[in-house]
Amino acid sequence: MRWEDFRTSSNVEDRRGMGLPGGAGGLGIGTIVILGLLGWALGIDPRILIGGAEMMTGGGSGYQQQQGRQGTPQDEMGRFASAVLGNTEDVWSTVLPQQANRQYQAPKLVLFSDATRSGCGGAQSAMGPFYCPLDQTVYIDLSFFEEMQRRFRAGGDFAYAYVLAHEVGHHVENQLGILPRVQERQQQVGRAEANQLSVRVELMADCLAGVWAHHSNQRWRSLEPGDIEEAIHAAEAIGDDRLQKQSQGRVVPDSFTHGSSEQRMRWLTTGLKAGQIQACDTFRASRL
Ligand SMILES: [Zn+2]
C-alpha cells in the first residue's frame, strides 16, 4: 500500500511506554498479545456487545484521564497508524455526508503498550485492538501487527490498515446509530441470537473497511498489486472458525462473534468493490 502521501491525523494520542500503576500483571507480553489476537477475532473487540455490560459499569467510576503525547509519532509504525487514520478521516468525511447525509465526527486513536485506561474500562494488549463507543476511541497496541505476521503469516501494511479500518468501521456504525440499537436488542435476546447480532456488526465493519479502501484507492491510488490478497488473507486467517479450530480443535458456530473466514473475506470484498455503505447492510442481507 502506498501510504506515504496520506495526511497524518491529529487525533492520535501516543501512550506507549507510559505503563500503568501496577502494570499488566504477571502475564508476559507474548502471552498477552497472542490472547489479543484471539480476542480480536473471537469478538472481544466491540466490548460493548456480548459480555460487555460489566465493562461499561466498571468503566465510568474508576476512569482516570491518562494523557499521552499528541502529534505524529516519529517511529515507522506509529506514523503508519497515524497516516491510515488520517486517510480514513479524509474518506469518511466525504463519503458519510454523500451516502448517509451525516457529518463525520472523527474518532480518536490511542496507541498504548501493555495496558491503559479507556472509556470502556481497563484496556490490555490481550484484548486486541478495539473501539470504545463511550469515548469514541480506537485502542491498539501496535505489537498486534507483529503478531499477525509472526503467528498467522498475515502481515503487510494493507493487512494492518484493514485492522485499523475495521475498528474505524465500528465508529462509522456508531455514527449511524447502529451500535446502540444492536446493544439494546442484545439485552433482550438469548445468547445465540446475541452472537448472531455481533457477527452482523463485525461483518459490517469488515465491509466498511472495504468501502474505505475503495475510496482511498480511487483518490490516492493507494492500492498496489497484492494488497487486496494480503487483506483477504488476513481476514481469512482471523476468521472465527479458523481460530476456534486452532484453539479448541472444533468449530462452534453459535459462539461465532466475528464471522467465519469465508464471511469476513466476502464482506470485505463486497465493500471494496461497491464503495457503498448501503452494500454493507448485513442486517438486511439474506445471506450473511
Ligand atoms: Zn470488530
Pin down the residues of each PLM region.
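A Zn2+-metalloprotease active-site environment signal
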Residues: F6-G17, A24, G28-T257, M265-L288
